[in-house]
Each structure stands twice: as structure tokens, then as C-alpha cells.
Amino acid sequence: FLTYGLGLREREEYDFQAADLGNVCHRALERFSYKVEREAGDWLKLTEEKRKQYVEESVEEAIADYGNSILYSSSRNAYLIVRMKRMLEKTVWALTKQLAAGDFKPSAYELRFANGKIDRVDTCEDGDCVYVKVIDYKTGSKSFDVTALYHGLQLQLMVYMDAALQLEQKKHPEK
């Protein structure tokens, strides 16, 4: 009677999943980028201590946005948060090294267009040309596959690049 008559069932318990980890990491990286832009102005000017501080703050802010009572509800989740901070420190270090090795500079973060959002757009101005690079943050291990692109199975980055190019052309109509 309780199950069929009243429709009672066991309460579902929330469990922090891989998708949640990806969402929090993504939000933390977004917050980190805005902090750098606002407070330091340039990724390459950050000291290692500042970079670690920004990562720590960004993760904590992203967790608060997500509902920190849930994320700190178990030892497992607390461990995942520590792991997430370490992973983001390595990610930010690698992204900084990539910027240092080239002439591209971040131009836009969380760039919204039609029905999507580009995580980051980097640009490099060279004379009368502007080169554009699209960065899509992923926590998984998916890699770019030219064959899948050719067969229309992996179009997201191409759509993002087209949108970024159109937006940059509006910014730099003379180039």
C-alpha cells in the first residue's frame, strides 16, 4: 500500500559524480581567469604564490556556487576537492607555460554566441592580421579527431572557431 497506494519510495541521496567535478573545475577555471584579468592583468605576471592563491580562492568560490554543504558532506568529497585543487594548479601552470611560449594573449573568456559558450579565445596580432585560437576546457581525455570532424561527428570546435572569427572580425574590421 505504501509503495503503490501512496507512491512512497526511498529518498535518493545525492552523490558527487564525475560530471559535477567537471562543472566545478570549469567554474573554478573561469573564476581564476577573471581574477587574473581583474587583479594581475596578465597570466605571465603572476607569481607562483599568487597563482596558487587564486586557484585556492577560485575553487572555494566555485564550490560555494555549487552548494558547499553537499560537497563537504563526506570524506570522499573532501578528498575530491583536494584532488581538484591539485589538478587545477597543474592545469593553470600548463596554460601559463603555453601562453609564455607563444605570442597569443587571452582576448575573451566565456564568450557567448547564438546557442553556445566558448571557454576562452586567444588572439595574436601580427601586422594587418589577427590570428585566433579557441580553447575549450575539458576534464576528460577527449582529443581532436580529424576523421570525426570530416564525417561531421565532432563539429563543436569548428562551430566555436567560426563564431570566434566572426566576433574578432567585428572587433578588428580593418584586419
Task: Name each region found by the language model.
Residues 28-113:
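A non-catalytic, helix-rich entry segment at domain boundaries
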Residues 2-9, 37-38, 61-72, 135-143:
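Short acidic (Asp/Glu) and glycine-rich catalytic loops that position anionic groups and cofactors
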Residues 2-3, 26-33, 85, 89-92, ...:
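Short, well-ordered alpha-helical packing segments
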Residues 11-22, 74, 78, 146-151:
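Short, charged/polar micro-motifs that form catalytic or ligand-binding hotspots
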Residues 8-16, 38-44, 169-171:
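Short, polar/flexible loop-turn hinges at active-site or ligand-entry regions and domain interfaces
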Residues 106-168:
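Non-catalytic protein-protein interaction segments used by genome-maintenance enzymes to assemble
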Residues 101-104, 170-175:
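Short helix-terminating capping/connector loops at secondary-structure junctions
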Residues 1-31, 35:
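C-terminal, charged and often intrinsically disordered regions of DNA end-processing helicases
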